[in-house]
Amino acid sequence: MRQAFGVDHTRSSSVRLRFAALLALVAASLIGPGSRSEAKGREQKTAGLPSTDELPGFQQTTPLWAWADFCNRHRSECASDAADPSVVRLTKATWDTINAVNRHVNATIKPLSDQDHWGMVDRWDLPEDGYGDCEDYQLLKRKMLAEKGLPRRAMRMTVVIDDKREGHAVLMVRTDRGDFILDNKTNFVLGWNQTSYTFVKREGDDGASWVSLGGVIPPFATANR
């Protein structure tokens, strides 16, 4: 009787093991493909999207007088909601929108210095009459992108020194794939470290304050000087 009972017990354990293995296979067939599909979906959403480095800011610094003057005249353009994200999640749709706005503004606005336009050395404004200096291009891009749903906190007006050693303004869009530059000098949206510029300062998190960028020179620019 003990021997017969032992045989039955062994068979019972074997059956339970086979049943557990079967359940594991069924679970894998139900869950595995879904997980793989989700992972594949995430890869497809970011496939072909560029990535670059983040450009960190340093201590607070004084905003440009022309920026403060612009904000006094266009308060809604400088308003910043602390609840908004300071970084954009980059998707193909968002990337396409950023590039389309950059190209559109570059093609639409005609260059005109502030001195010729306003009789002033430096004035920041929206180019409502179709003419503008570098900063005016970027302010319009910023406005258009905000209207398309990008948070203003993730779009920073930025002051650089260009390859002619002159002051220049660009728009930096901060994303989860790095910081990208919109520029009236090119239709290509580049990572900040792919430009030839020296980065001086940019808007801070709250719109009113600015932060120093420490005169950072991208490796690309250093190699070409």
Label each PLM-derived region with a short phrase.
Residues 1-15:
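N-terminal secretory signal peptides that target proteins for export/translocation
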Residues 2-3, 29, 75, 177:
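Generic secretory/membrane-interface signal
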Residues 9-11, 29, 134:
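Helix-centric, low-specificity signal for extended rod-like, repetitive segments
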Residues 13-15, 33, 138-139:
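Short alpha-helical segments used as structural interaction elements across diverse proteins
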Residues 18-24:
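Sec-dependent N-terminal signal peptides
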Residues 29-36:
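C-terminal segment of classical bacterial N-terminal signal peptides
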Residues 36-225:
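A structural boundary/capping signal
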